Swiss-Prot record:
The gene is tsaD. Its cofactor is Fe(2+). HAMAP family: TsaD. This is tRNA N6-adenosine threonylcarbamoyltransferase. PANTHER family: TRNA N6-ADENOSINE THREONYLCARBAMOYLTRANSFERASE, TRNA N6-ADENOSINE THREONYLCARBAMOYLTRANSFERASE, MITOCHONDRIAL.
Length: 348
């Protein structure tokens, strides 16, 4: 008797990407559709929630059909329907949740609600097998966290940002530099052309915990630029980008390496939109390579196309919940403030 393949149709609509995917056995992408809204939000310098919701409504039915067609699947081939239910923009989340619930009720296919952050981390599962326990640095527009995983469904935060997330900081300083939203890719490219000449602060780098603070860096950057404007001094944009990125990468990599030394995970994962940053990817790979062999974890850096918001990562995470029998019912609702649990040590 052959083992039955498990196919999951996944929805993602937590922010400004509408995405659907069909994932087989939690590892194989049979289809992935992403309808981006970046051009609609660029003129505003960031995501406008109402605009995002309207775009989700316009495309979600069509991209659901496209995901099934690309996977050569019908509803009869789908074993579960997965959807991001938080965190994110409440209006945007509701579009995906409503679509997934409607499909589940109409077809009788089980429903699985997925935490968006769990999805970002599980994008690694689409590239390679994760050995547990695992540790992840999750860096995106809304979150900057170090997450410990004892298995595929039990996650706890051991380090968190106390103010700005890394991606948020990139976008805010991007506005100062005149870079279109989203600014991360351009600043990363500029950083590789400049030098760390401004020596911006590395907040909390030597603190005993694994928390982060990026608001001071953001303020120092903005003040430097404003002061230069006042005295009519022209600053090199490449050096500004390099100095900003050096500060972010130094702090993130330093605390991540310390966490690896303490928790000794078998696998290290970099997840989230900022995981596409080449400066961060390169530094972490270099620092982990220097670790002693007995504590050096396997490293999984997700493919660049899976760093941003997408439904494939939601399908991967949902597969683990499916295998554990963790299903949702018709009462599933959007939870814009949904959080992974914090480690007990952080609550003392």
């Amino acid at each position: 008797m052959t083992k039955k393949d498990i196919r999951i149709l996944a929805f993602e609509s937590s922010c400004d990407e509408t995405s659907t995917a069909v994932i087989k056995n939690g590892r194989e992408i049979e289809s992935l559709i992403v309808a981006t809204q970046i051009k609609s939000h660029q003129r505003f310098g960031g995501v406008v929630p109402e605009v995002a919701s309207r775009h989700h409504i316009e495309v979600i039915t069509q991209i659901t059909k496209e995901a099934l067609a690309e996977a050569n699947a019908t509803w009869d081939d789908i074993d579960a329907i997965a959807v991001t239910y938080g965190p994110g923009l409440v209006g945007a989340l509701l579009i995906g949740v409503s679509a997934a619930k409607a499909a589940s009720m109409a077809t009788g296919i089980p429903l699985i609600g997925v935490d968006h952050i769990m999805g970002h981390i599980m994008a690694a599962q689409l590239k390679d097998e994760i050995e547990y326990p695992a540790l992840a640095l999750q860096v995106s527009g809304g979150h900057t966290e170090i997450v410990l995983m004892k298995d595929p469904i039990h996650f706890e935060i051991v380090g968190d940002t106390r103010d700005d997330a890394a991606g948020e900081a990139y976008d805010k300083i991007g506005r100062v530099l005149g870079v279109n939203y989203p600014a991360g890719k351009t600043i990363d490219e500029w950083a590789h052309k400049g030098k760390d000449t401004f020596h911006f602060p590395r907040a909390m780098m030597e603190d005993d915990d694994y928390d982060f603070s990026l608001s001071g860096l953001k303020s120092a950057f903005i003040n430097t630029c404003h002061h230069a404007d006042q005295i009519h001094e022209k600053l090199d944009k490449y050096d500004l980008a390099a100095s900003f990125q050096a500060s972010v990468v130094d702090v993130l990599s330093h605390k991540t390496i310390r966490a690896i030394k303490e928790y000794k995970p078998k696998t290290f994962i970099l997840g989230g939109g900022v995981a596409a940053n080449h400066g961060l990817r390169d530094r972490l790979a270099e620092e982990i390579e220097k670790l002693p062999a007995d504590i050096k974890p396997k490293v999984i850096l997700p493919d660049l196309k899976l760093c941003g918001d997408n439904a494939a990562m939601i399908g991967a995470a949902a597969y683990n919940l499916y295998k554990a029998g963790k299903f949702s019912d018709e009462n599933l609702n959007a939870d814009p403030s949904l959080e992974l649990p914090y480690a007990d040590s952080m609550l003392k």
